[in-house]
Amino acid sequence: MFTINAEVRKEQGKGASRRLRAANKFPAIIYGGKEAPLAIELDHDKVMNMQAKAEFYSEVLTIVVDGKEIKVKAQDVQRHPYKPKLQHIDFVRA
């Protein structure tokens, strides 16, 4: 079971996403279910190590946002074209 700590994004848009990536974080979103979509930011290195395992894409993950646990599955992963970096992940509530 994977547990990921996340923070709610305060800013959105291209410039805000670039600032996140420069700070070794990256944007993500949680959607699905009856709740509203939630824009979050994740630590790049921690998630990069987790996603190296195949189970990251098949198991239910736990994301902790403001002390609240959300069960999700990775739906879509966007990677940098030539660098070994994650650009964005879509999570769907499980």
From Swiss-Prot:
Keywords: Ribonucleoprotein, Ribosomal protein, RNA-binding, rRNA-binding. The keyword Metal-binding does not apply. GO terms for molecular function: 5S rRNA binding; structural constituent of ribosome. Disulfide bonds: none annotated. The keyword Cytoplasm does not apply. One of its GO terms (biological process) is negative regulation of translation. GO terms for cellular component: cytoplasm; cytosol; cytosolic large ribosomal subunit. Belongs to the bacterial ribosomal protein bL25 family. Part of the 50S ribosomal subunit; part of the 5S rRNA/L5/L18/L25 subcomplex. Contacts the 5S rRNA. This is one of the proteins that binds to the 5S RNA in the ribosome where it forms part of the central protuberance. Binds to the 5S rRNA independently of L5 and L18. Not required for binding of the 5S rRNA/L5/L18 subcomplex to 23S rRNA. PANTHER family: RIBOSOMAL PROTEIN L25/GLN-TRNA SYNTHETASE, ANTI-CODON-BINDING DOMAIN-CONTAINING PROTEIN, RIBOSOMAL PROTEIN L25_GLN-TRNA SYNTHETASE, ANTI-CODON-BINDING DOMAIN-CONTAINING PROTEIN. This is Large ribosomal subunit protein bL25. The lineage of its organism: Bacteria, Pseudomonadati, Pseudomonadota, Gammaproteobacteria, Enterobacterales.
